[in-house]
Design a protein with these regions (language model features):
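Hydrophobic core of transmembrane alpha-helices in multi-pass small-molecule transporters
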Residues: 113, 124-142, 291, 383, ...
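Intracellular juxtamembrane helix-capping segments at the cytosolic ends
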Residues: 35, 39, 138-165, 304, ...
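Extracytoplasmic gate region of multi-pass secondary transporters
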Residues: 28-39, 268, 274-338, 409, ...
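Cytosolic juxtamembrane N-terminal segment immediately preceding the first transmembrane helix
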Residues: 1-41, 45-69, 257-284
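Conserved MFS/SLC helix-loop-helix module at the cytosolic interface between two early adjacent transmembrane helices
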Residues: 8, 85-126
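Long, low-complexity inter-transmembrane loops of multi-pass membrane transporters
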Residues: 210-284, 288, 299, 303, ...
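Glycine-rich segments within core transmembrane alpha-helices of 12-TM secondary carriers
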Residues: 135, 142-144, 151-206, 326-338, ...
C-alpha cells in the first residue's frame, strides 16, 4: 500500500464495510426460493390456484397452483433480467458521474424496492414486480461501486474482487433469515421496513468511506478519499490541485514511462478505443460464455421452489427443509469465491516480480485460463446433478451450485478487470 493518504484503518474499514454491504444487501434476490415460501404462506397470487382431483400422499385433495408458481417465476425472471439489462447503462453512469452519484441512485432504488415489498399485500401482489427489479438493480449497482475497493490493496486486487462477488452470492441467505424470523412470528412488513432503514448506513458509507469519483489503479502518492477533516495535510485532492495542468493524472498515468507528447516508441502499443474493446473476439466470447452459464443458474433458482414441491409431492415441511438447506449453502459463497482469486493471482506471489505493461497483462490473462476451466467443470457437474429427479441428490446440487456461481461471478469480475 502506498504511504500517506488514507491510512490502513480507513482502508480496512472500507474493505470490511463493503464486505458487509455486499453480503447483506446486494444479491438478496437470488434467495428468491426462501422468500417465495413466505409469500405463498401469506397468500400472494393464491387466487390463481385451481381445484384438482389429484390426491396428496395423505389422501387430501391439493389445489393446482402451477399458475401461482408461474407468477412467482415471472417476478424472479424480470428481476434477474433487469439485473443484467440495466448493468450497462448503470456502468455508464458510474464511469461518467462517479461513485457518489451511482451509489445515490442505487440507494434510492434499493430503498424503494424494500418499501414496495413492505407495503405489498396479497391483494397488491403485483407490487412484487417493480420491487424485485429495483432491489436487483440497486444491489448490482452497489456491487459495481464496491469492486474498485480492490484497487486499494495492490497485489491482492483479484482476491478482494472475488471476495466481494462471493459476498454478493452469500447475500441470498438474507431471505432465509427473513423466512426463519417469519416462522418465529415477525411480520414481513417489519423486516423490510428495517431493511429500508438500513439505507441510512449505506448513505453514511457513501460519504465517509467511498470516493467521490473513482479509486485509481495504481494508486497515486498520498491517495485519500471520503469526507475529511478540514486542514488535513496530504490528500489526493491536494495532489491533484498541485499537479501542473499538462501533467497526466493518476488515472491517466501509464504503467511504463511514455514517450514525449506526439511521439510513440517502437514497442508501445496504440491506444485501444472502447468500441474496439466491445467488438473484440475475447469480449464477445466472454459475454456469450457468461450468458449461458448465468442462464443455467437463473433457471435453477427461479424454478427451485416448484421443483422441490414436485419432488416432495406437496409436503410443505420437506420443501421448507430443502429450501433452508439451499439457503444455508449460499452462505458459503463468500468462503468459496476467494479460491478463484488465489488461482487468478497465483503468478503474483512468486519471488519474481510481476512484469509491467503489456507483458504483465498477458501474464494475468494466462493465469485466468485455469480459472475458466475450473468454473466450466463445476457448472457441468452442477447441471448433471440438477437433472437427477431425486431429493437427496439435491444436497449435492446445492453445493455444486454455490461453488459454480461463486467461481463464475468472481472470476468474471476479475477477468474483466485484467483483460
Amino acid at each position: 500500500m502506498a504511504g500517506g493518504g488514507a491510512g490502513v484503518a480507513k482502508r480496512l474499514g472500507t474493505l470490511l464495510s463493503g464486505l458487509l454491504e455486499c453480503g447483506a444487501f446486494c444479491g438478496i434476490i437470488f434467495g428468491w426460493a426462501s422468500l417465495v415460501f413466505v409469500l405463498k404462506d401469506l397468500g400472494y397470487f393464491k387466487d390463481l390456484c385451481q381445484p384438482t382431483a389429484t390426491p396428496s400422499p395423505n389422501r387430501t385433495l391439493l389445489p393446482d397452483c402451477s399458475w401461482q408458481d408461474e407468477q412467482f417465476s415471472l417476478v424472479f425472471t424480470i428481476g434477474s433480467f433487469m439485473n443484467n439489462f440495466v448493468t450497462f447503462p448503470m456502468g455508464f453512469i458510474f464511469d461518467r458521474f462517479g461513485t457518489t452519484v451511482a451509489r445515490l441512485i442505487a440507494i434510492s432504488l434499493y430503498t424503494g424496492g424494500t418499501l414496495l415489498v413492505a407495503f405489498s399485500t396479497p391483494e397488491l401482489a403485483v407490487l412484487l414486480f417493480p420491487a424485485m427489479s429495483m432491489l436487483s438493480v440497486g444491489g448490482i449497482l452497489l456491487l459495481l461501486t464496491n469492486m474498485q475497493v480492490g484497487n486499494l490493496f495492490g497485489k491482492y486486487r483479484s482476491i478482494i474482487i472475488t471476495l466481494y462477488n462471493g459476498a454478493f452470492d452469500s447475500s441470498s441467505a438474507i431471505f432465509l433469515i427473513i423466512k426463519v424470523l417469519y416462522e418465529h412470528g415477525l411480520s414481513l412488513r417489519a423486516m423490510f421496513l428495517f431493511m429500508a432503514a438500513c439505507s441510512a448506513w449505506h448513505l453514511l458509507r457513501t460519504l465517509f468511506l467511498m470516493p467521490r469519483t473513482h479509486i485509481p489503479y495504481p494508486l497515486p502518492p498520498a491517495y485519500d478519499y471520503g469526507l475529511r477533516c478540514p486542514g488535513r495535510s496530504q490528500s489526493y485532492r491536494t495532489y491533484e490541485e498541485k499537479r501542473p495542468p499538462g501533467e497526466a493524472g493518476p488515472e491517466e498515468t501509464p504503467l511504463e514511462p511514455s514517450a514525449p507528447r506526439g511521439a510513440r516508441g517502437d514497442g508501445d502499443p496504440p491506444g485501444v478505443s472502447f468500441r474496439a474493446c466491445v467488438c473484440s473476439r475475447v469480449f464477445a466470447w466472454h459475454v456469450a460464455w457468461l450468458s449461458v452459464m448465468q442462464l443455467r443458474h437463473y433457471l435453477f433458482i427461479g424454478t427451485l421452489n416448484p421443483l422441490l414441491d414436485h419432488l416432495a409431492r406437496g409436503d410443505s415441511h420437506l420443501v421448507s427443509t430443502y429450501t433452508n438447506a439451499f439457503a444455508f449453502t449460499q452462505l458459503c459463497g463468500v468462503l468459496c469465491a476467494p479460491w478463484n482469486g488465489l488461482i487468478l493471482d497465483r503468478h503474483k506471489r512468486g519471488k519474481t516480480p510481476r512484469p509491467e505493461g503489456a507483458v504483465g497483462a498477458l501474464a494475468d490473462l494466462r493465469a485466468s485460463v485455469l480459472s475458466l476451466v475450473v468454473t466450466v467443470t463445476l457448472c457441468v457437474l452442477f447441471s448433471v446433478c440438477a437433472a437427477v429427479p431425486m431429493l437427496p441428490v439435491q444436497f449435492a446440487t446445492f453445493v455444486l451450485q454455490v461453488l459454480s456461481r461463486s467461481f463464475l461471478y468472481g472470476g468474471n469480475a476479475a477477468f474483466l478487470a485484467i483483460a
